[in-house]
Every structure is written in structure tokens, then in C-alpha cells.
Swiss-Prot record:
Organism name: Kluyveromyces lactis (strain ATCC 8585 / CBS 2359 / DSM 70799 / NBRC 1267 / NRRL Y-1140 / WM37) (Yeast)
Keyword Lyase set for record: no
Compartment(s) where it occurs, according to its Swiss-Prot or TrEMBL record: Nucleus
Keyword annotations: Nucleus, Ribosome biogenesis, rRNA processing
GO BP field: rRNA processing
UniProt feature, compositional bias: Low complexity: 736-750
Name of this protein: Pre-rRNA-processing protein RIX1
Subunit structure: Component of the RIX1 complex, composed of IPI1, RIX1/IPI2 and IPI3 in a 1:2:2 stoichiometry. The complex interacts (via RIX1) with MDN1 (via its hexameric AAA ATPase ring) and the pre-60S ribosome particles.
Superkingdom in the source lineage: Eukaryota
Coiled coil: none
Chain segments carrying region Disordered: 699-776
Length: 776
């Protein structure tokens, strides 16, 4: 049956008056592949496109909004419309966008017009993405329009950076040559966003600003005049990019030297030499430091002016991350040595390593601000190292030992002694979890080969402390008790009673004021703890604390969110597989917690299964059967008796093979060596005994009429030697249960048998219990 669809001409009549669910139904109908028909261009498609153009040219924001969505859906699902009408749609869209941007002040005062402006911008972006990559469309529709679209987006970027920066970033990367005439103007806009308004935006927008600034250096600058002895050298494609990275690096050293007025660098001469070796512009080669910021103004009398240092380093770190992490169409030369040196220098700016200047120790406010600023500078070093380790991985293996030793300086330590200051640790919780993320990335390349175990021991204690849900009410109760002990006037008591009544929830519901830990932080903590448990043997106390944390939090989160996060499942699995020095396993607890998780590791541990190749390999049994044919009775009377003995012996030993019991013949084979085994011919496989209950049943020995034919069963000593056809077989001490076969001849009257004797092959266990049975 042919597919029946609504004609586009009918949709054209409805779309102008449609609202709400009716408009959504029209958009859903436009996704149908039935309309991808070139024969409809002059009929239904032409009518519907004319209606869409009318909506886009309307003065009502709602009609423009509907036209934008209809154009985006139709062009995304109909290649015929895209190829035939993209040029016309793009022209109308950027014309309407220009009218909104030119009157942005009036537009921003109306929520409807502001929403329409954002919809127009996104529709232009969608249409450009659909056109890009198609040669004819790009040449005829996109490239001529970019000279008008780029200035509009640059102007709007000053007001709506989070909206325009992603579009401009793609244009810089995909249409670098077309963007070149606007590079200088765009650089001015980005410089203003970086130096003045950077802290006003969220992290995503800050990252977009830095990425656009980095991609701006894809545009080649005018070639500078080179020296005569350098003119014959070919300019590399990343020359402009590399010079920009070095320009950012050069701005770190003056800021680090400025911290020399706060910290006493003179106590460590190696520190001074290390700072002097940081990247610096070389005047001999004509390197010029591109000053992005104005000179920094810091006054010790105004302690909060020190925050300018932290702000400057933060912006430089974000710019550096963009330069080293963004993909380009050509290979890059990244100065890893200089970047890592900068990060290590930032991590060394700590009161754990260097003391404050003497004149600054007396002022409490200034000291507190300095410590906070230094902590922020150290954190920026961690952020840059985190980006490097993710982008370049094992390329920085050479620097791992120095990086790990520098990271230990980030852990706050009390003024006296080497104890960890957990109060400061809890105040910088997010920063510590970023440190754990960096450690997880670094240790993933080295594992147990890392020698800096002190750092991991400290971080284990810190991690277990931070994942605990705590409140800050401990000091509150102390201050309340102190306030009650102070003598107060009647008015003060009334004010205090009013305040205490408003804060009654603190006393009645203290659990409501507990600081929660985010799930992403749990993931980083669990990944770190799994890494530590897997690669090193921890002290028993830490191992027990990790087990307690994993089990308790798994139960708690399962009750709160209805499932156990994947990171906790991995941590529990690691604890079971690597119990450390603990004698007891938490396997039953872990299996009970993860019974609905379909954990394959626990499934194998609880239900072990041997591979089928081990169960269905009959080769070993056939070799043993051939070896038994060579054994003979020590006191055999005739060839017929020997044949009967061998046959009975094979039946018993076949049963022992089925149960995996080691026999004396196996010991004889091992002593003689593999050479003797190979020389003996292989025999056909015999069928396995069907009745397994007969394997270990001792055969009753019938009383013999003649004492000469009766044989005594004796338990051989571990060092006793027995003769077998002139050969001496030494039976050593065997820890396993040995089944020895002693061939005896018994005579009995068998009416249906041709022979008057029957051979009985009793089974003797080499154990004390068997001695008692023999005596009976």
C-alpha cells in the first residue's frame, strides 16, 4: 500500500495560523521522505517555500520564530529543498538577523524579540553546517554570504558571547581564509572579553573565549622580515601557533617573581635557579613578548589587591590549555618542558615549602589573603598538568617523578609537624578532587612502578575523609555555648531569643545541613581507591576503611537513588580481587550488594567453571593405560594369569583415572621419565565404568583352600623398595592419596569358568585407616 501524506500545499495554508501542538504536528510531518521529490519543486514545494519566506519577513516575532523552525526541519530532512532553496533562505535569515542586532538595546528589552534573535542565530548556524562540505552549495550559497554573516556575529558576540562564540569558532577553523579580513577586529573584541569581563561568564563561556583566541592564530600574519642567514629556511605551518604559545608562557615568569616579595625565595638557592630557567623571551633572536594585559598593580597595604595575581594566572592558564589541547589541521610543536616547569614553579609557591617574609607574618588579614592566593596559584598548576596529561599521555613520562613530588606540596600541612590539616582540606574539596583526577590519569600510565608512595598514602586518607558527609555545625554549637556564658542585657537577650527561634531547625534537624558529595566526585574517589588497592599493599587500617566506605556508601546510594553507581561496582570488584593483607574476603557482601548488576567476575567466583578443553581431553588417560600394560605380577605363575591380572588392573585404574587419583604406576612413570613413556605403544581407549559406586568398594577376598596360594596385604613403607621383574621401584612420600594395586591370585570354584582360579585385585589406601581394615 502506498504511503499517504498530507500535501505541502495544505500544510502551507495551516502553518501561518497554527499554534502549539498543531505546529509541532506540522514539523513532524515535514520530516517525511515523501517530500524528497524533484517533481514537487514547481508545485507543492514552491508554494510551501513561499509561505516560509513570508513568515521570515513578518514583523511579528512569533511568525519569525515559526519560520526559523520550519526552515531548519525542512532543510535538514529534504536534500531537494536544501540544494534548491538554501541560498534564498540564508539571505533572508541574515537580513532579519541584521535588523535585530542593529537594534539590540530594544530587542533585549522584549523577551519575545530576544528569543527570536537567538532562534535566528541558531538557524543560520544550522543552515551553514548543512551547506558546508557540499562544493557547489558552498561556492554559490555560503562563501558569498560569509562576508556579511561574520561581522554580524562579531557584533552580537559582545552582547551574547555564549551564543555566538561556538559559531565563530567553527568559522575560524573551517573558513580561515574568509575570516582573515576580520581578524584584527575580532582580536580587539576577544582582548576586551579576556581582560575585563572574563570573570563574569561561566566556565563554558570562558573556555569558548580562550578557544576562539587560540584559533585566531590559525590566520597567518604578515610575513616579518627575516635575517639574511635565515631567509633560505622554510617557514613551518605552526610557526604562528608556536610563537603564540611562547608569548603566553613568557607572561608567567614575572608573576612568579612577584611572589618573591611574599615568600622568601632566598632559603632555597635551587628554587632561585629554577625560576631563572623559566621560559623568557630572547632578545638576541628577536622574540617579542605579546603583552595581552596591562601592567599589574598590587599594594600590600590593600591586601585584597593580591587577588589580581591569581586572576591573571588563571586567565593565562586557560589560554595555555586552549593552545595545547585544540585540534588543528597541521602538526604542532609544543614546548612541554617549559610548560611543565611553569606548573612545577606554581606548585612550589606554598608555605609548606617556603616561609613568608618576616614583615608579613604579623598581619592576620594579609597572611590569610596570601595563603588563599598561593593556594589558587597552585591549583592553576594542577589544572594545566591535568590538560597536558590527558592530551599527551605517555609523552610526559620523563617528567612523572618531578611532577608527583611537586603535587605533594599541594596537600595542606599543619604549622607544627607533618600532620595533614584536614580543616583546610575540607575547605578546598573541589580542588582536591581535581588533584585526584590528575593522579588517576598519571598513575594509569605507570601503576605499581610509581615510587612516590607517601603521596598516595596521604591522598588515601584525604579521600576517605572527603567522601564522608559532614556538616559545619561543630563550631556553631561551641559559639552558642560561649554566647550564653556572656552576661547580656535584657534587650540583648530578647534579640538573642528571636535569633535562636529562627535557627531552631539547626537543633531539631541537623541532618538537613549536611554537605552532600556530588556523584562525579565519588567517581574520581572510587577510581583512585581502586588504583591504590590494585597496585600497592596498604596498611590494614586503610584497607579496612576502604572496605567500610565501599559497602556503606553502596547501600546508602542504593537507597537514595535506586541503584549502585558503576564506580562503586568496580571498587567492590577490585577489593574482592585484591584483598591485600586481609584474611577474610568480602565476596558474600559484595555479591549481595550487586546481585542485580550481572557482574561477570562475581559470577565466575561464585560458580567456577572449568574450560571444556580440560574436561574433554582423553589423551592423558590413554597414555596411562599403555603404561600399565608393562607392569607384571611379581609372583606370576603363568601367562594366562598375567593377562588376567593386567585386565583387572586396567579396570580398577580406569576407575581411578575417572576420579583423578594418583596411582603407584603414575609414580613409576614419573620416575622413569618421559622417554620411557613415549616408546610404549598407545592402546585403544576403554569405556568409562558406568557404576561409580563400585570405584572405591573393596573386593572381598575369599578364603583360599591352600595357605601357599594366599597372599598377605601389607602397607608399603615410604622408603620400602619392591621388586618388579628384576627392577626396583622406589615409592617416595606422596602427599596425595595413593591407590596401589597389588595383584594376587585367588583360587575359587567357578562352575561356568574354564579356569579354577579367580584373580582378585583389592584396593589399598596408604593411610592409617587402611591398616585397620587390613588387620580385620
Amino acid at each position: 500500500m502506498a504511503t499517504v501524506t498530507v500535501p505541502l500545499s495544505s500544510l502551507a495554508k495551516l502553518i501561518e495560523e497554527s499554534e502549539g501542538s498543531q505546529f509541532r504536528s506540522i514539523l513532524q510531518t515535514l520530516r517525511s521522505p515523501t517530500y524528497v521529490n524533484q517533481s514537487l519543486l514547481k508545485s507543492d514545494i514552491g508554494v510551501f517555500v513561499a509561505k516560509l519566506l513570508k513568515l521570515l519577513r513578518s514583523s511579528e516575532p512569533y511568525q519569525i520564530w515559526k519560520g526559523c523552525h520550519a526552515v531548519a526541519v525542512l532543510c535538514s530532512n529534504n536534500p531537494v529543498v536544501l540544494c534548491s532553496q538554501a541560498n534564498q533562505f540564508l539571505t533572508v535569515l541574515y537580513t532579519r538577523l541584521e535588523s535585530f542586532i542593529n537594534f539590540y538595546v530594544e530587542t533585549s528589552q522584549s523577551a519575545a524579540r530576544l528569543t527570536t534573535l537567538k532562534t535566528l542565530t541558531r538557524t543560520v548556524d544550522i543552515l551553514m553546517d548543512l551547506i558546508r562540505g557540499k562544493p557547489t552549495l558552498t561556492r554559490e550559497a555560503l562563501t558569498p554570504k560569509l562576508n556579511a554573516v561574520i561581522p554580524l556575529l562579531m557584533t552580537l558576540c559582545q552582547y551574547e558571547p555564549e551564543l555566538c562564540l561556538p559559531i565563530l569558532k567553527k568559522l575560524l577553523l573551517q573558513n580561515t581564509t574568509t575570516f582573515k579580513p576580520f581578524a584584527n577586529k575580532y582580536r580587539v573584541i576577544l582582548n576586551r572579553l579576556i581582560t575585563k569581563d572574563f570573570q563574569l561568564y561561566d566556565r563554558t563561556t570562558q573556555r569558548l573565549i580562550c578557544d576562539n583566541f587560540a584559533y585566531l592564530h590559525l590566520i597567518k600574519q604578515n610575513a616579518q622580515k627575516l635575517e639574511e642567514n635565515q631567509e633560505h629556511h622554510k617557514t613551518l605551518m605552526d610557526e604562528n601557533w608556536r610563537s603564540s604559545i611562547l608569548s603566553v608562557l613568557y607572561q608567567f615568569k614575572p608573576l612568579i617573581l612577584l611572589c618573591g616579595d611574599i615568600l622568601d625565595f632566598s632559603v632555597d638557592s635551587e628554587m632561585l635557579n629554577f625560576i631563572d630557567s623559566l621560559p623568557t623571551p630572547k632578545k638576541d633572536t628577536g622574540e617579542i613578548k605579546d603583552e595581552l594585559f596591562a601592567p599589574l598593580s598590587v599594594d600590600m597595604n590593600e591586601s585584597f589587591s593580591l587577588w589580581e595575581i591569581s586572576y591573571r594566572v588563571e586567565v593565562l592558564s586557560q589560554l595555555l590549555i586552549s593552545f595545547i589541547s585544540l585540534p588543528t589541521s597541521f602538526p604542532l610543536r609544543i614546548p612541554l618542558h617549559g610548560i611543565i616547569d611553569i606548573c612545577q614553579a606554581l606548585l612550589m609557591l606554598s608555605t609548606n615549602y617556603l616561609p613568608l617574609k618576616r614583615g608579613l607574618r604579623r598581619e592576620t588579614e594579609l597572611t590569610a589573603v596570601i595563603i588563599t592566593v598561593l593556594r589558587s596559584l597552585q591549583y592553576q598548576g594542577i589544572v594545566v598538568l591535568k590538560s597536558i596529561s590527558r592530551c599527551y599521555g605517555k609523552d610526559i613520562l620523563y617528567y612523572y617523578s618531578s611532577i608527583l613530588s611537586s603535587l605533594e606540596l599541594f596537600i595542606p600541612i599543619k604549622a607544627r609537624g607533618n600532620a595533614i590539616d584536614y580543616e583546610k582540606v575540607e575547605s578546598m574539596k573541589e580542588q582536591v578532587f581535581d588533584l585526584l583526577s590528575l593522579i588517576n590519569t598519571l598513575a594509569g600510565h605507570l601503576g605499581h612502578k610509581i615510587d612516590e608512595l607517601d603521596l598516595f598514602t596521604k591522598l588515601t586518607d584525604i579521600t576517605l575523609r572527603l567522601v564522608e558527609e559532614k556538616s559545619n555545625l561543630g563550631k556553631f554549637y561551641t559559639t552558642v555555648n560561649d554566647a550564653k556564658s556572656i552576661k547580656q542585657t535584657t534587650k540583648q537577650k530578647k534579640d538573642y531569643n528571636k535569633m535562636a527561634g529562627a535557627m531552631s531547625d539547626i537543633y531539631s534537624h541537623p541532618k538537613q545541613f549536611v554537605n552532600k558529595t556530588e556523584l562525579r566526585w565519588y567517581d574520581e574517589a572510587n577510581k583512585f581507591l581502586s588504583l591504590v588497592v590494585q597496585n600497592w599493599k596498604l596498611p590494614s587500617t586503610q584497607q579496612v576503611n576502604i572496605i567500610k566506605y565501599a559497602t556503606v556508601m553502596s547501600i546508602t546510594l542504593n537507597e537514595q537513588i535506586g541503584n549502585i553507581p558503576e564506580s562503586f561496582e568496580e571498587l567492590l570488584t577490585t577489593i574482592v580481587l585484591y584483598p591485600g593483607s586481609e584474611r577474610l574476603s568480602i565476596l558474600p557482601i559484595a555479591v549481595g550488594l550487586l546481585k542485580n548488576m550481572d557482574n561477570k567476575v562475581f559470577d565466575v567466583l561464585c560458580n567456577p567453571r572449568l574450560p571444556f578443553s580440560c574436561l574433554l581431553n582423553p589423551g592423558s588417560s590413554s597414555i596411562r593405560k599403555d603404561i600399565r600394560n608393562a607392569l607384571k605380577m611379581p609372583n606370576g605363575d603363568s601367562d594366562e594369569t598375567e593377562e588376567t591380572i593386567v585386565t583387572g588392573q586396567q579396570d580398577v585404574l580406569d576407575q581411578s583415572d575417572a576420579n583423578g587419583i594418583v596411582t603407584a604406576n603414575d609414580i613409576e612413570r614419573d620416575r622413569d621419565g618421559p622417554e620411557n613413556s613415549i616408546e610404549k605403544p598407545l592402546s585403544a581407549l576403554t569405556s568409562i565404568v558406568s557404576d561409580e559406586s563400585q570405584i572405591f568398594r573393596k573386593r572381598a577376598v575369599e578364603e583360599s583352600e591352600s595357605e601357599e596360594e594366599e597372599t598377605k596385604r601389607q602397607r608399603p613403607d615410604s622408603a620400602e623398595e619392591t621388586e618388579n621383574n628384576g627392577e626396583t621401584v622406589v615409592i617416595p612420600n606422596v602427599p596425595t592419596q595413593v591407590l596401589q594395586t597389588v595383584e594376587t591370585t585367588e583360587t575359587a570354584q567357578q562352575p561356568d569358568s574354564d579356569s579354577d582360579s579367580e584373580i582378585e585385585i583389592p584396593t589399598i589406601n596408604v593411610s592409617d585407616n587402611d591398616d585397620d581394615d587390613d588387620e580385620e
